[in-house]
C-alpha cells in the first residue's frame, strides 16, 4: 500500500480511538517494509512489533524503526504472548487472490495465511478480555472482492465480525443474498474501501 493511502487508514483509526496519539500502539503482521508502522510513528504513535520473514524488508525497518520488535513468522506467533496493541494491521499474501494469479483464493497456501492473522487477533482478544486490539486494518488487492465469486470476501467479513464474540458482542454471521449484503449494520463497525494510488500523490495507477 502506498504511504499516503496507509496514512489515511491509520489516521482514522487514531482518531476513532479517542486517546492521545503518544499512547497508541500498533502491531503489523505480514509487515513488508514497514509502511503501517511508519504511519503510526508519523501520527505520533508507537509501532511496537512487526512480523516479517524476508531479510531485506526487515533490514529497512530495523534502520528506520530501530525500537520496533521483530517477531518472525506469523505461524510461530501466539497472540496471547505478545504485547497487546490498539491497532493490528496486516497485508496477508495476495497471490492467490489476485486476478493475475491462478486464484486459488483463501484455500491457497499463501493467501490462506490470512487465517493466521485472525488466529493471532483472536488469541490477543481472549487474553485481554476483549480489550485489545481495538482496530484491525487488512490491506489487499481488489481481486480479494471477486475471488471465488465473492465467497472469499464473505469469509473475510465473517471472520472479522466473529471477532466480536471476544468483546462481549456475541458471534455474528454476515449473510450474502442475491449479490447484496444484509445482517451487517447491527453487528459492529466493519468497512472496506478501494483506493487508487494515483489520486493520493503517488505516480502510479495502483488499487
PLM features: what roles do these ranges have?
Residues 1-53, 57:
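S-adenosyl-L-methionine
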Residues 61-62:
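Conserved SAM-binding loop
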Amino acid at each position: 500500500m502506498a504511504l499516503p493511502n496507509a496514512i489515511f487508514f491509520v489516521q482514522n483509526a487514531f482518531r476513532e480511538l479517542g486517546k492521545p496519539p503518544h499512547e497508541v500502539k500498533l502491531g503489523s503482521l505480514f509487515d513488508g517494509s514497514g509502511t503501517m508502522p511508519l504511519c503510526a510513528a508519523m501520527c505520533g504513535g508507537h509501532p511496537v512489533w512487526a512480523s516479517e520473514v524476508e531479510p531485506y524488508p526487515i533490514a529497512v525497518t530495523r534502520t528506520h524503526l530501530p525500537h520496533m520488535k521483530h517477531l518472525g513468522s506469523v505461524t510461530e506467533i501466539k497472540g496471547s504472548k505478545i504485547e497487546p496493541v490498539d491497532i493490528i494491521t496486516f497485508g496477508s499474501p495476495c497471490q492467490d487472490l489476485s486476478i493475475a494469479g491462478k486464484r486459488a483464493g483463501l484455500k491457497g497456501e499463501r493467501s490462506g495465511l490470512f487465517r493466521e492473522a485472525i488466529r493471532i487477533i483472536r488469541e490477543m482478544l481472549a487474553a485481554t478480555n476483549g480489550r485489545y486490539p481495538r482496530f484491525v486494518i487488512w490491506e489487499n488487492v481488489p481481486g480479494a472482492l471477486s475471488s471465488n465469486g465473492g465467497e472469499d470476501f464473505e469469509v473475510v467479513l465473517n471472520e472479522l465480525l466473529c471477532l466480536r464474540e471476544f468483546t462481549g458482542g456475541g458471534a455474528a454471521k454476515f449473510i450474502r443474498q442475491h449479490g447484496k449484503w444484509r445482517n451487517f449494520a447491527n453487528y459492529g463497525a466493519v468497512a472496506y474501501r478501494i483506493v487508487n494510488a494515483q489520486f493520493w500523490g503517488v505516480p502510479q495507477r495502483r488499487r
